[in-house]
Design a protein with these regions (language model features):
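Bacterial N-terminal signal peptides that target proteins for export
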Residues: 1-8
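C-terminal motif of bacterial Sec signal peptides marking the signal peptidase cleavage site
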Residues: 16-19
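Proteolytic cleavage junctions
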Residues: 21-97, 108, 141-145, 158-228
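Structural beta-strand segments of beta-rich domains
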Residues: 146-150
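Short edge beta-strand/loop segments characteristic of extracellular beta-sandwich folds
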Residues: 151-155
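Short beta-strand elements of extracellular/lumenal beta-sandwich folds
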Residues: 130-137
Length: 228
């Protein structure tokens, strides 16, 4: 099995909402996104696919690992399903909640390396942003044959989506009507909405990632956000 070193470029994924109008039910086009903030500073843990454990019809995961530096890495292997799941513990209810799940089966091409053969690996690193609800994904420019499946939960915001300190009907309207997954490549770029699937019951977005870099970017930070 050939292993591929990771790139130094980082591509970020974040959740955000924009400011709403003064009227509780009114919404206006945003000048820019306002990132969703954690309702508190959570404690994170991560589990990755355990390649030594083979369970029919189930994903076998390693024991939870505390994220001291808020980052976790795993080897994505072409032709094999590999996953990472990041959870957080809330001091509000003292329960463990899901935050992110990333599953890959077909890492196809790495910048500077080329196409991967079946069984070749690339090291993927996920870094959690502790100030806003978001993560960074690397290596940049990694392309997938079959898209990687990304799922991210936003209930860590505590229901306060517009940042006014309370969770009320305005937040519910924002969530149900205009919340979406967006991204940008660099600070000077406008935000662009992605065709992600939203689950109001789970308070999550799911998106099929064709690659970590949506466009040909050299040394730019790509941010992804939930916005309206």
């Amino acid at each position: 099995m050939k292993f591929v070193r990771r790139s130094i470029l980082v591509f970020a994924l974040a959740l955000a909402v924009a400011r709403c109008a003064d009227q509780p039910t009114a919404v206006k086009a945003p000048a820019g996104p306002q990132f969703l903030r954690w309702a508190e500073t959570p404690q994170f843990s991560a589990r990755t696919t355990d390649p030594r454990a083979r369970r029919s019809g189930a994903m076998a995961l390693t024991p939870p690992l505390s994220l001291e530096q808020y980052a976790v890495s795993f080897w994505a292997v072409r032709g094999e399903s590999r996953s990472v799941q990041i959870n957080y513990r809330s001091s509000i209810d003292n329960n463990v909640h899901p935050f992110l799940q990333l599953t890959t089966t077909d890492p196809q091409s790495v910048p500077g390396v080329g196409e991967l053969a079946m069984g070749d690996s690339v090291l993927i690193t996920v870094t959690v942003d502790t100030t806003k609800i978001g993560v960074s994904l690397e290596p940049s420019g990694l392309q997938f044959g079959a898209p990687a499946q990304l799922k991210i939960w936003y209930d860590g915001a505590g229901g306060d989506l517009n940042g006014d300190g309370v969770a009320d009907s305005t937040d519910a309207a924002i969530e149900a009507q205009v919340l979406g997954l967006w991204y940008r490549e660099k600070d000077s770029d406008p935000w662009t909405k992605l065709g992600a699937s939203q689950s109001l019951d789970e308070k999550s977005f799911t998106y099929a990632l064709p690659h970590f870099c949506e466009y040909d970017v050299a040394e730019a930070l790509m941010e992804w956000a939930v916005n309206y």
